A protein has these predicted regions:
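Flexible, low-complexity segments enriched in proline/glycine/serine and punctuated by aromatic residues
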Residues: 1-103
């Protein structure tokens, strides 16, 4: 297996987790812990899939899903995507420039 296949799996895991989270109500998402992670195995490689939950206001919660593959000595690859959900259920994507802190 090649690294590009690993990165494709990381992207796929992010998309799947975001799809799952988008199905949940605002009240459920707002109660998620600020950070939770789990280890994923892809061939011989392991990476971390993390969910970041940030309550931006009483009416808005931001969810970011991040995949991180650690290579060595603090060097690795991070990918991230996310959305913001309003109390009324409206969902907007987290802008690209605001995702940089997660990559």
């Amino acid at each position: 297996m090649k690294k590009k296949e690993l990165y494709a799996d990381m992207q796929s895991s992010i998309a799947a987790r975001l799809a799952e989270l988008r199905q949940r109500d605002f009240s459920v998402l707002a109660e998620l812990p600020k950070y939770a992670d789990e280890t994923h195995q892809f061939g011989k490689w392991e990476y971390t899939l993390a969910v970041w939950c940030d309550r931006k206001s009483e009416d808005m919660t931001q969810i970011v899903v991040q995949a991180y593959y650690h290579w060595m000595l603090g060097i690795g690859t991070m990918l991230a995507d996310g959305f913001r959900i309003q109390k009324d259920g409206r969902i907007v994507e987290v802008p690209q420039d605001e995702r940089y802190e997660f990559t």
